[in-house]
């Protein structure tokens, strides 16, 4: 993956393709790196079952019960939609191509988990369709569970948690939070709710400052918009400057939307491998993806791999099949 300059890992999709397209267009105009656009689908509470569509006349109670039971069994299969893929032909990416960049979009799923749903969610086949997995956690017990076996999670987000800092219990568990950071799980702060009224703004700053404090100066944190409309997006340098209000130096603040964001994307990509050691890609496509810690593109990586005799032999055998 090429080095990115600025990335917003939380541009929300609310079911309106035109609105999502407008959000991405604005992000592009504001200067976010062309390589990264993350479209987020937030499904709320994973374990919550919506049975509104099961209401029937009183004389069909048995049928209601049957449908309710079927819904409870299959709810985790139907609650997760397919990722939303933006039609790139509707975007003007000519400037990026002239600068030697390529447009890439990533899908993201955000969900609220609890102790009873984490196992089902981890093994839900539809989850694997998404590039980035972000979760909201209600308490430190679940956070500790993710620290031990959370290799399927990329982000723990404060997005959607509209509470005072005193009500987010895990924000006072520095050792647990730091242990999550040590295993590669990042924490996300979203600034859009700070633009939606004084109470939301107070909640945003209190939670953000506490998270900055317990992560020792923003280590393992990204800053995203969480925007579902263009007016809530801010330019990269404005977002970087915002971090100074948390008590961070300016350059450290900019890492929250650049270097740290890229680390999240690299972790997400290695989730498609076996412990990050083996990567499977389709070489029949025009742009096969080969992960690189040095920032080289796939063509350079393939040329280097082709210098290895064993690799060339394997490729020759595959071409003969």
Which ranges hold each PLM region?
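Charged catalytic cores and adjacent phosphate/nucleic-acid-binding surfaces used
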Residues: 1-37, 43-91, 128, 143-321
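N-terminal active-site wall of soluble small-molecule enzyme domains
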Residues: 82-127
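Short, polar loop motifs at secondary-structure junctions
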Residues: 138-142
